[in-house]
UniProtKB/Swiss-Prot annotation:
HAMAP family: RNApol_bact_RpoB. Belongs to the RNA polymerase beta chain family. One of its GO terms (biological process) is DNA-templated transcription. NCBIfam families: PRK00405.1, rpoB. One of its GO terms (molecular function) is ribonucleoside binding. Its EC number is 2.7.7.6. This is DNA-directed RNA polymerase subunit beta. InterPro entries: DNA-dir_RNA_pol_bsu_ext_1_sf (IPR042107), DNA-dir_RNA_pol_bsu_external_1 (IPR019462), DNA-dir_RNA_pol_su2 (IPR015712), DNA-dir_RNAP_su2_dom (IPR007120), DNA-dir_RNAP_su2_hyb_sf (IPR037033), RNA_pol_bsu_bac (IPR010243), RNA_pol_bsu_CS (IPR007121), RNA_pol_bsu_protrusion (IPR007644). The keyword Membrane does not apply. One of its GO terms (cellular component) is DNA-directed RNA polymerase complex. In cyanobacteria the RNAP catalytic core is composed of 2 alpha, 1 beta, 1 beta', 1 gamma and 1 omega subunit. When a sigma factor is associated with the core the holoenzyme is formed, which can initiate transcription. Pfam families: RNA_pol_Rpb2_1 (PF04563), RNA_pol_Rpb2_2 (PF04561), RNA_pol_Rpb2_3 (PF04565), RNA_pol_Rpb2_45 (PF10385), RNA_pol_Rpb2_6 (PF00562), RNA_pol_Rpb2_7 (PF04560). DNA-dependent RNA polymerase catalyzes the transcription of DNA into RNA using the four ribonucleoside triphosphates as substrates.
Length: 1095
């Protein structure tokens, strides 16, 4: 392996900070964005012009947050800081100036991990990718097949301006998609004479037709043009010259209404080769004339004018947290402005102070709305460290000001050549969001204008210059350069060795000599995202399967004992570190104290730095967050060193699954259609056991009849059922609970109406007031069980904020260990997923020549058609590594070391393993990678040799325990009286339209009838059926389904005379209801009902 290959491997395994996108954007907001908004906002003058209120943005202050991050999570509070800004109120008449520091609202702060804590939940603001403001030139074909061109000027906020040509070579303009106006009318309205325009254009002869057309319409002066403009833009209103002037002014030349933004001004200057200063962000006459000139050049096909590709990343920009927040602050401040103006007018001028004028509510509401309900503010995916990291690097085209799923066509979703090294071509969801939600590539970063950049090494005369930092280029700059891929072979001095090098130039592929190359990519992994870069032998997988592999790694459940992959890519350490799930040393120093809850590092100056560890905390996805120290007392540590493993980490590396022994062979049909056959070892040795923590909550509320009480005294519950409750009636920590057990005892007062007749009788006789409360306790739901790990009690006395009407809130956290079982979903890293179909005893599994039983049997037919051969390479590499007792790191795209490199490497490792003493059977040159297995049940060898090896296999979050569900009796929908649907509502199985057809096709009339009546919504019938079953009598004939009655009533309510009649013409009264529920039957239900029917 040459030295350059080692350098490439190093570049591939060293990545920039992966959460920088979030952090740097929020920092920009605090340093610049917020001040910009406050400055743009002032001064505010009242309607008379007497008073002026100035906000001094540069002097804003943030107070220390009320709670720290952990405390905010515990109290369901928001981790936020109070914003104060200095305001100056100037009275123009008296010259009096009042200055005051005013509270303007709470600003949620970003945690070190790039997240926000809102109402106790961790949230992430997803980056949005939108069309960049600027000027765009497009061509369209009209219905006669003739090409017309148009130019759109798109601002950051304000009205769109669109110029277009038509078949008569006339130029038109549209404002915000309104009616067409002759372009020269706009020029005249802007105060430009014919000569002003003609002097600016390179081909004025084309434009003269538009001037003539304007003259023919009788619009020859500025005033007439303004009237015409007003008529077109405000039809139906009486036109006036002053109105037209004001309209034009506010639409395009008023900075409050029209803003190109820094980016828009930069893009327009670049496209039209103008030199307008950056701070002039409204439209200028020069902009409009240059746009017209460029459009005419396009039409005449001269002057090197080119069309724009709107899907090119040079024309799309990323809005990160800071900018999204800035836009929201602007909305809040605009609402505030109205309030301030009103208060200025209403109040006494002399006694007004800034504090009386400024009301923080509108700003607080705007910020709260953004973090609480914006489409881009998402509940963080915390299943494992990779899921968390990917969520922070996600880039979405949806959201306010972006696209919608329905409207987005194929072009937007497609992979574009400019994505190279910027957005990952692999990682995107399957389904309706495909291509709209992307992931940032590993080395990509977002520049100050919001364009995505990717790094390169400069090449001069065929030699790589690696001194200093790499050069970052945005998509439009890169188009002008010849860029070679990251895996070109170079010698010691960095000279490119090949005679011809493949390069990308202007979105095309060419082959050039090394001297013509401008840049070389930094690393082969810079093209793909973090999740995709964790897949070894990625280059051998079909893209669709690699996509599934990337997405499924994010769904891997953290296991009880994580294990690092035998075959990795070298990025595992950094993913674990940047995800924020592992504690990292902030200083160089020495570990002076370690236990399960904290690690103390003493720096060289002798100062102590304490790192607190998380113990069995619940994540957003109910998985378990837990830290295990990996340093010992007295160990020296350096800045950035991992001190403890988090969930799904081992030794500071990400460890999503387990390395298990896999054989690719069919076994009695148990791995048909992607099913997976596993050994009992995975269950017994807790290889795939995970801990899940469920949260149960109950409120004691104030009711009309008095307060609800949390207590141990629960009516009609035996003492043994209360064994685990403390004197308050709350479960003790450490208790083991099963479904139906009481977690928190609660009684609710009940009124007179709630009492059954026999209780009223007793009270009438004995005159004593029985305890009139009913049991409303929090119980463990069906199918759940586990151990109580935490109980939290919130009351107003302790200073907790409670929901309105609640006196006390109790939360109980129950942890359960889930072993792997039939029905759980498992997957490898190459998109090879399946459901466990059977768990076999160890002794029945096929076994190797040395007697080791395999752990998993996969179907070999899952490989060829899906073309994800990477799994086979991983399997054999893992087999070699396990026999050599080492771990292997393989950078994806390894062809730079030579052709067929993966194959050669794996073969070499297998041969090396076979040379070890007693291991000659590990590799058979006649059948490389295959072994002859024996059947565990009979001891007979199988017919054919089988591919066997170690692969990293994951258990996914789709667990059968959360999905399986059954119902015998349960709740019904109020209107239709049909059973509810879904596991959460204890619902039934829907017998839909197609199932009805199937039964009809077989003529199964009675089955069908009972399914549609007695088993569903015939209220009287189902009670009678229950009665008959209990008494052992035959089930009576079904009656009318309730949903039929609802339909009849709906038709009658439309005024249709519609009814149901018997054979002899008698109308059936649908309104006559048999009351199915007597409020509280005094005898057991079925007896009382039975008596009624017998009567």
């Amino acid at each position: 392996m040459s030295r350059s290959a080692i350098q490439v491997a190093k570049a591939a395994t060293y990545l920039p900070d992966l959460v920088e996108v979030q952090r740097s954007s929020f920092k920009w907001f605090l340093d610049k964005g917020l001040i910009e908004e406050l400055d743009n906002f002032s001064p505010i003058t009242d309607y008379t012009g007497k008073l002026e209120l100035h906000f001094i943005g540069a002097e804003y202050k943030l107070k220390r947050p009320r709670h720290d991050v952990e405390e905010a999570k515990r109290r369901d509070a928001t981790f936020a800081s109070q914003m104060y800004v200095t305001c100056r109120l100037v009275n123009k008449e008296t010259g009096e100036i009042k200055e005051q520091e005013v509270f303007i609202g709470e600003l949620p702060l970003m945690t070190e991990r790039g997240t926000f804590i809102i109402n106790g939940a961790e949230r992430v603001i997803v980056n949005q990718i939108v069309r960049s403001p600027g000027v765009y030139f497009k061509d369209e074909q009209d219905k006669n097949g003739r090409r017309t061109y148009n130019a759109s000027v798109i601002p950051n906020r304000g009205a769109w301006l669109k110029f277009e040509t038509d078949k008569n070579d006339l130029l038109h303009v549209r404002v915000d998609k309104t009616r067409k106006i002759n372009a020269h009318v706009l020029m005249r309205a802007m105060g430009l004479s014919d000569n002003d325009v003609i002097d600016k254009l390179r081909h004025p002869e084309f434009y003269k037709k538009s001037i003539d057309a304007a003259n023919e319409e009788g619009i020859s002066s500025e005033d007439q043009a303004l009237l015409e403009l007003y008529k077109k833009l405000r039809p139906g209103e009486p036109p006036s010259v002053s109105g037209g002037q004001q309209l034009l002014q506010t639409r395009f030349f008023d900075p409050k209404r029209y803003d190109l933004g820094r980016v828009g001004r930069y893009k327009i200057n670049k496209k039209l080769r103008l030199t307008i200063p950056d701070n002039l962000r409204t439209l200028t006459n020069e902009d409009v004339l240059s746009t017209l000139d460029y459009l005419i050049n396009l039409e005449l096909d001269v002057g090197g004018a080119t069309l724009d590709d709107i899907d090119h990343l040079g024309n799309r920009r990323v809005r990160s947290v800071g900018e999204l927040l800035q836009n929201q602050v602007r909305v809040g401040l605009n609402r505030l402005e109205r309030i301030i103006k009103e208060r200025m007018t209403v109040g006494e001028t002399d006694s007004l102070t800034p504090a009386q004028l400024v009301n923080p509510k509108p700003l607080v509401a705007a910020i709260k709305e953004f973090f609480g309900s914006s489409q881009l503010s998402q509940f963080m995916d915390q299943t494992n460290p990779l899921a968390e990291l990917t969520h922070k690097r996600r880039i979405s085209a949806l959201g306010p000001g972006g696209l919608t799923r329905e409207r987005a066509g194929f072009a937007v979703r497609d992979i574009h050549p400019s994505h190279y090294g910027r957005l990952c071509p692999i990682e995107t969801p399957e389904g309706p969001n495909a291509g709209l939600i992307n992931s940032l590539a590993t080395h990509a970063r977002v520049n100050e204008y919001g364009f995505i950049e990717t790094p390169f090494w400069k090449v001069e005369n065929g030699r790589l210059i690696k001194e200093g930092d790499p050069i970052y280029l945005s998509a439009d700059l890169e188009d002008e350069c010849r860029v070679a891929p990251g895996d070109v072979a170079t010698n010691e001095e960095g000279k490119i060795m090949a005679e011809l090098v493949p390069v990308r130039y202007r979105q095309d592929f060419e082959t050039v000599s090394p001297e013509q190359v401008d840049y070389v990519q930094l690393s082969p992994v810079q093209v793909i995202s973090v999740a995709a870069s964790l897949i070894p032998f990625l280059e051998h997988d079909d893209a669709n399967r690699a996509l599934m592999g990337s997405n499924m790694q994010r769904q891997a459940v953290p296991l009880l004992r994580p294990e690092r992959p035998l075959v990795g890519t070298g990025l595992e350490t950094q993913v674990a570190r940047d995800s924020g799930m592992v504690p990292i040393s902030k200083v160089n120093g020495k570990v002076t104290y370690v236990d399960a809850n904290a690690i103390v590092v003493t720096d060289d100056e002798g100062n102590d730095h304490t790192h607190y560890l998380q113990k069995y905390q619940r994540s957003n996805q109910d998985t378990c967050l837990n830290h295990r120290p990996i340093v010992f007392n007295g160990d020296p540590v350096i800045v950035g060193q991992v001190l403890a493993d988090g969930s799904a980490c081992e030794g500071g590396e990400i460890a999503l699954g387990q390395n298990v022994l896999i054989a690719y062979m069919p076994w009695e049909g148990y791995n048909y259609e992607d099913a997976i056959l596993v050994s009992e070892r995975l269950v017994k040795d807790d290889l795939y056991t995970s801990v899940h923590i469920e949260k149960y909550e109950i409120e004691a509320r104030q009711t009309k009849l008095g307060p609800e009480e949390i207590t141990r005294e629960i009516p009609n519950v035996s003492e043994e059922n209360l064994g685990n409750l403390d004197e308050m009636g709350i479960i003790r920590i450490g208790a083991y609970v099963e479904s139906g057990d009481i977690l928190v005892g609660k009684v609710t007062p009940k009124g007179e109406s709630d009492q059954p007749p026999e209780e009223k009788l007793l009270r009438a006789i004995f005159g004593e007031k029985a305890r009139d409360v009913r049991d409303n306790s929090l119980r463990v739901p069906s199918t759940e069980r586990g151990r109580v790990v935490d109980v939290r009690i919130y009351t107003r006395e302790q200073g907790d904020e409670l929901p309105p009407g609640a006196n006390m809130v109790v939360r109980v956290y129950v942890a359960q260990r889930r072993k792997i079982q039939v029905g759980d979903k498992m997957a490898g890293r190459h998109g090879n997923k399946g459901i466990i179909s059977r768990i076999l005893p160890r002794e029945d599994m096929p076994y190797l020549p040395d007697g080791t039983p395999v752990d998993i049997c996969l179907n070999p037919l899952g490989v060829p058609s899906r073309m994800n051969v990477g799994q086979v390479f991983e399997l054999l590499m893992g087999w070699a590594a396990s026999n050599l007792d080492c771990r292997v790191k393989i950078v994806p795209f390894d062809e730079m070391y030579g052709p067929e490199m993966s194959n050669q490497t794996v073969q070499a490792y297998l041969k090396k393993a076979a040379k070890q003493p007693g291991k000659s059977w590990v590799y058979n040159p006649k059948d490389p990678g295959k072994l002859l297995l024996k059947d565990g049940r009979t001891g007979e060898p199988f017919d054919q040799p089988v591919a066997v090896g170690y692969a990293h296999f994951l258990k996914l979050v789709h667990l059968v325990d959360d999905k399986i569900h059954a119902r015998s009796t349960g709740p019904y929908s109020l209107v239709t009286q049909q059973p509810l649907g879904g596991k959460a509502q204890q619902g039934g199985q829907r017998l839909g339209e197609m199932e009805v057809w199937a039964l009809e096709a077989y003529g199964a009339a009675y089955t069908l009838q009972e399914l549609l009546t007695v088993k569903s919504d015939d209220m009287q019938g189902r009670n009678e059926a229950l009665n008959s079953i209990v008494k052992g009598k035959p089930i009576p004939r079904p009656g009318t389904p309730e949903s039929f009655k609802v339909l009849m009533r709906e038709l009658q309510s439309l005024g249709l005379d519609i009814g149901v009649y018997t054979d002899d013409g008698k109308e059936v009264d649908l309104m006559q209801d048999v009351n199915p529920r007597r409020s509280t039957p005094s005898r057991p239900t079925y007896e009382s009902l039975g008596k009624e029917y017998e009567e």
